[in-house]
């Protein structure tokens, strides 16, 4: 028998039959082994047909095992030396199968031919006995085979892949709607109406839904399926079936050339033979362009074009704008066969309606309650803070994650109860240890401990009962809601079937009863809600918390500790940045306005230009602000503008254009802000940058956004922008006023600024703040700050630092220069003071646990051990 004439499944079953014979120590390969191999084939046609005939497959497999077990076995050396030989009956079956394949007008011997041959040849044998026992007849087998195969012919070595192709590679959306498994679709009426109009055309009746990811393209098709089930569609679309095609399943496992095309042709043939009853929905339709394309083979797009043009294939596609442009528009012949339906992102108000429609499904799934305030917050906050995704998807994700968070808290032990149980465990361990001691103190402690343990045990029992009761209440409500949802689904089903008795039973009996029970359960929970251990509601706070986790932007309501921190922000800034009260006040006020929710939503939190001589605290203020807001300086995006002196350096901020090296990496500024949307951005020494760089700043300062080299919008609305400059520092050094900046000096500085920067740039900045030169009082405070840093480093070595007033005076005289600010002071402390201390430590004069005394003698700094 020529193996090339057999399908792959028949060849596989013969190999499996041989292995079964070896496993059971049979010397002969007989029909029963081949029958066993066919029945045990994974996703095989024979077990599929038997299941459709109502045969219990497990029972059938047991009967086969019993029959094979009865066959003669050869054990020991004789079994190893002699191989397994095929019986004459096996060859008879294969010859008969070949004859049957010719009767069926098939090109290959397939598994159904082999099965029919076995039924004929082994009527009185082991296989015949099993078939009779399980009520499997030839006529019954042929009847189901015709249903499965239809008019298909075996023209390839893998024909099973083409039988019931739509069931294998598609999902029936109409059935899912009937089974109440799809989420309700709210709104989108205009898009659904447009899709219905296109589907009702004579030719080119193929809508393609185009929209951004997450705007609800697939939901529109599900909404259409819902309408078809309800009968809320034109006459031409009633009783249509929507099948969602799974391109992944269609391609997966197609090893040989032509196998993919064969499967797709089988799908298209089924759609065609339905005579317009089936609407084929291909999600991510751009995948058909190039799908299955190998050397010389046609891709899926070219295979469906002729049917689309003739109107034989009703197809609904869905894809994004980018993919439509990249794949579909390039293929003009494919593009003209589809009619685009643009799906816009819904507004915040529409999103709220969509979420209200989905609310009940999420409540049932998570077993919790969702407040309406949470729904409104999810729509508003996601729209405001999550810029790179689209409504309603991002808002739905927020609700889902908040529900999951509350659910996981319900399923885990409440914190109060957990603390008590851990304490009981600790005290029991201590009790065990004390019970072995005999002294009076231990006995007294044991009595006190037993009393404390008894109290805790009572408290634990009381709280455990309360916890179990609350949990059972929540579970009961969840089960009742699931039951109510199921009852509503059944009511819809019976309404479609016009079974009015059952509809009345459900609508006026079961459903009101379940609603009453849910209300009762929720009322009893409300009563105990004040001191409840478990929280079972999603509120605005949970949504804010998740937004904060996703973006790093503080959206949550202010807790007491944070209120204090914000109110003390100005004070904290002044502790590090000495003598610049105007600057610290302006920055602190901007942050407070933003955190209270009163800032302009379209602009950054604040944008400032700090002017002043070098070393007066301009950059230090930005660092201190970052440290206070984020507890670290990591959230400061520092860009030294001296690196942007050339015109072409602008591309480094937003990323180079396509075709240039580094295009994929993006820009230094845009990528940093995309990763950390809530940060302080410091543009240091802005006067050093090229004029063209400031053109970028205009849209950042005005609209709080910037478009990078890939066309993506980066959101700057939650950043604080600080620019520093030394422009006008010559005038500022002449300032003699101790309190503020003199008017004529301020005017001179502003005139110089206007000469250097364009008016449209200066006009968009919130505040231009001038820093005064440091006073002698300020220098003393700065010395204390610098010495505190040295002290902290020495503390790590367990060395204490003491500095006399004379030493501080010398540091102020030697280290301070009005032109250079505090930087020379820092250098002086580093070069003189730290060096002297280091020498003493190396020499062993100052060691761990000692006190280093810093004194001033004859205008010099002296370091000694106290």
From Swiss-Prot:
Annotated segments matching region NBD2: 562-773
Intracellular or extracellular location(s): Cytoplasm
Residue span of region Repeat 2: 86-151
Gene Ontology MF, one: ATP binding
Originating gene: clpB
Protein name from the UniProt record: Chaperone protein ClpB
InterPro entries reported in the protein's UniProt record: AAA+_ATPase, ATPase_AAA_core, Chaperonin_ClpB, Clp_ATPase_C, Clp_N_dom_sf, Clp_R_dom, ClpA/B, ClpA/B_CS1
Keywords for this protein: ATP-binding, Chaperone, Coiled coil, Cytoplasm, Nucleotide-binding, Repeat, Stress response
PANTHER family, per the entry: ATP-DEPENDENT CLP PROTEASE, HEAT SHOCK PROTEIN 104
NCBIfam families (alphabetical): chaperone_ClpB (TIGR03346)
Binding sites annotated in the UniProt record for ATP 1: 211-218
């Amino acid at each position: 028998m020529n193996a090339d004439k057999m399908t792959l499944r028949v060849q596989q079953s013969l190999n499996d039959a041989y292995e079964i014979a070896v496993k059971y120590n049979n010397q002969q390969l007989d029909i029963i082994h081949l029958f066993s191999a066919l029945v045990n084939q994974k996703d095989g046609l024979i077990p599929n047909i038997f299941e459709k005939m109502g045969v219990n497959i497990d029972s059938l497999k047991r009967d086969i095992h019993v029959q094979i077990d009865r066959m003669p076995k050869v054990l020991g050396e004789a079994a190893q030396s002699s191989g397994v030989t095929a019986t004459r009956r096996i060859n008879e079956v294969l010859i008969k199968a070949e004859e049957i394949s010719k009767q069926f007008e098939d090109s290959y011997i397939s598994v159904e031919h082999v099965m029919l041959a076995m039924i004929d040849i082994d009527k009185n044998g082991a296989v015949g006995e099993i078939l009779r026992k399980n009520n499997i007849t030839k006529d019954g087998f042929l009847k189901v085979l015709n249903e499965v195969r239809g008019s298909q012919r075996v023209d390839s070595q893998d024909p099973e892949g083409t039988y019931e192709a739509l069931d294998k590679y598609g999902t029936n959306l109409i059935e899912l709607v009937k089974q109440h498994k799809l989420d309700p679709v709210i709104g989108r009426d205009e898009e659904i109406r447009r899709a219905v109009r296109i589907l009702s055309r004579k030719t080119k009746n193929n809508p393609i839904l185009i929209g951004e990811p997450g705007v609800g393209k697939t939901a529109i098709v599900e909404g259409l399926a819902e309408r078809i089930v309800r009968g809320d569609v034109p006459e031409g679309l009633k009783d249509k079936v929507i099948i969602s095609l799974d391109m992944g399943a269609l391609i997966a496992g197609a090893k040989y050339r032509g196998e993919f095309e064969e499967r797709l042709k089988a799908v298209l043939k089924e759609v065609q033979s339905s005579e317009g009853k089936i609407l084929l929905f291909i999600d991510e339709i751009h995948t058909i362009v190039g799908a299955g394309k190998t050397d010389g083979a046609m891709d899926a797009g070219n295979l469906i074009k002729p049917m689309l043009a003739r109107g034989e294939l009703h197809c609904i596609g869905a894809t994004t704008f980018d993919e439509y442009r990249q794949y579909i528009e390039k293929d003009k012949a494919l593009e003209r066969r589809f009619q685009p339906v643009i799906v816009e992102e819904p507004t915040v108000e529409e999103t709220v309606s969509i979420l209200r429609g989905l609310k009940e499904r999420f409540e049932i799934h998570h077993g919790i309650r969702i407040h309406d305030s949470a729904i409104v917050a999810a729509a508003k906050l996601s729209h405001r803070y999550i810029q790179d995704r689209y409504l309603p998807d991002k808002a739905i994700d927020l609700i889902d994650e908040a529900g999951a968070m509350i659910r996981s808290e319900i399923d885990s032990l409440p914190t109060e109860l957990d603390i008590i149980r851990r304490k009981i465990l600790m005290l029991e361990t201590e009790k065990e240890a004390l019970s072995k001691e005999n002294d009076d103190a231990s006995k007294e402690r044991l009595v006190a401990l037993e009393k404390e343990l008894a109290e805790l045990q009572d408290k634990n029992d009381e709280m455990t009962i309360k916890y179990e009761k609350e949990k059972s209440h929540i579970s009961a409500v969840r089960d009742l809601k699931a039951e109510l949802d199921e009852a509503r689904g059944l009511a819809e089903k019976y309404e479609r079937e016009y079974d009015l008795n059952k509809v009345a039973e459900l609508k006026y009996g079961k459903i009101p009863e379940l609603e009453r029970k849910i209300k009762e359960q929720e009322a009893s929970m409300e009563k105990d809600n004040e001191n409840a251990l478990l929280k079972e509601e999603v509120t605005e706070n949970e949504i804010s918390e998740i937004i904060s986790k996703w973006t790093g932007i503080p959206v949550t309501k202010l807790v007491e500790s944070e209120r204090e921190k914000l109110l003390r922000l100005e004070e904290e800034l002044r502790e590090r940045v000495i003598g610049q009260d105007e600057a610290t006040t302006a920055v602190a006020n901007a942050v407070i306005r933003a955190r209270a929710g009163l800032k302009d939503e379209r602009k950054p939190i604040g944008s400032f230009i700090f002017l002043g001589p070098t070393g007066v605290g301009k950059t230090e203020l930005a660092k201190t602000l970052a440290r206070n807001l984020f507890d670290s300086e990591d959230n400061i995006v520092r860009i030294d503008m001296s690196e942007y002196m050339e015109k072409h350096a602008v591309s480094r901020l937003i990323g180079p254009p396509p075709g240039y090296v580094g295009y994929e990496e993006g820009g230094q500024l845009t990528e940093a802000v995309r990763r950390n949307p809530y940060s302080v951005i410091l543009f240091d020494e802005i006067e050093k940058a090229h004029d063209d760089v400031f053109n970028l700043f205009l849209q950042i300062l005005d609209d709080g956004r910037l478009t990078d080299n890939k066309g993506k919008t980066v959101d700057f609305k939650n950043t604080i922008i600080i620019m520093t400059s030394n422009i006008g520092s010559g005038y500022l050094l002449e300032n003699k006023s101790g309190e503020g900046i003199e008017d004529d000096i301020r005017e001179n500085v502003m005139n110089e600024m206007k000469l250097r920067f364009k008016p449209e740039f200066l006009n968009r900045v919130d505040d231009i703040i001038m820093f005064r030169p440091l006073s002698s009082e300020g220098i003393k405070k700065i010395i204390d700050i610098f010495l505190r840093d040295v002290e902290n480093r020495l503390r790590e070595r367990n060395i204490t630092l003491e500095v006399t007033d004379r030493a501080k005076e010398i540091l102020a005289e030697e280290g301070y220069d009005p032109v250079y600010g505090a930087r020379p002071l820092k250098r002086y402390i580093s070069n003189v003071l730290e060096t002297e201390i280091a020498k003493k430590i190396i020499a062993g004069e100052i060691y761990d646990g000692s006190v280093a005394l810093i004194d001033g003698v004859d205008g010099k700094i002296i370091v000694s051990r106290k």
